[in-house]
């Protein structure tokens, strides 16, 4: 008898205690427990997985924007829903223009809030450049720059894009949405959501009003702020679009409805249906032309 040994691993370094995996789980096996974090009583949410409910499908692994959950089967990374093409992957579209990148700049490396970026600089002979400032202008011009990003952990916040020189890095968010702060309900000087946010510049406390403000430019709509907020309806999160690889799956349709809304799920279904109809028409036209 062949025994399958499954192992789920949560990397606490990358887990931001958001709600994505919990919402996407078809078995409702993932819950978020509240614990006291420190003396200031800032809440810290801890993920708990009910192994009796979990069927080890791997959806939590592939849907996590931060790549914090890993599923292994018999010691190897094996995800059944990917193998069967019954669930999509998040698209992490990151472009790097090495020609436009200043030779002596490390801004993107320093700016990444999750320390996912490393830059390597090599001279004409392919040797690592340790101190570019000691090189002549001619030597600098021949330096090749490589941008290394741990893409599986990148939530596409775009901080690197805006901190870097124009045109060097382009990042397309894989989740779009909107966060609304009800300032009447938001307690003055409360920083629960600010402390929970994994992207420091996405949500912040105003120096003037002492109330929370959101910078949608860098927000990844993970929901960590919503989970941490102690006041009901003080912070509202709406995900409107999730960019993913192609799939035709009932499991994804249900997950999309929970992650965004029923309207968005229906909209995507209609778009897929329209695209499929166009493909069928194109094939028929091509078939008719071949017959002629």
Enumerate the language-model features and the residues they cover.
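The feature marks the first
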Residues: 4-7, 13-36
């Amino acid at each position: 008898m062949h025994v399958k040994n499954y192992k789920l691993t949560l990397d606490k370094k990358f887990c931001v205690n958001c709600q994505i995996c919990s919402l996407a789980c078809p078995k409702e096996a993932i819950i978020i427990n509240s614990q006291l974090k420190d003396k200031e009583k800032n809440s810290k949410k801890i993920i708990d997985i009910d192994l009796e409910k979990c069927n080890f499908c791997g959806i939590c692994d592939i849907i996590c924007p931060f790549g914090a959950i890993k599923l292994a089967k018999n010691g190897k990374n094996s995800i059944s829903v990917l193998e069967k093409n019954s669930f999509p992957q998040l698209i992490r579209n990151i472009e790097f223009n090495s020609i436009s990148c200043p030779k002596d700049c490390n801004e993107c490396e320093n700016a990444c809030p999750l320390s996912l970026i490393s830059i390597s600089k090599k001279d004409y002979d392919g040797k690592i450049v340790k101190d570019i400032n000691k090189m002549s202008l001619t030597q600098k011009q021949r330096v090749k720059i490589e941008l290394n990003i741990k893409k599986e952990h990148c939530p596409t916040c775009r901080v690197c894009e805006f901190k870097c020189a124009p045109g060097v890095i382009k990042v397309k968010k894989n989740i779009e949405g909107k966060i609304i702060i009800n300032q009447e309900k938001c307690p003055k000087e409360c920083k629960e959501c600010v402390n929970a946010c994994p992207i420091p510049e996405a949500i912040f406390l105003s120096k003037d009003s002492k109330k929370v403000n959101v910078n949608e430019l860098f927000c990844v709509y993970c929901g960590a702020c919503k989970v941490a907020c102690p006041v009901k309806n003080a912070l509202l999160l709406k995900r409107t679009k999730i960019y993913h690889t192609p799939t035709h799956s009932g499991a994804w349709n249900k997950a999309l409805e929970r992650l965004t809304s029923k309207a968005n799920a229906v909209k995507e279904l209609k778009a897929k249906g329209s695209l499929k109809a166009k493909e069928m028409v194109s094939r028929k036209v091509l078939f008719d032309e071949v017959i002629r």
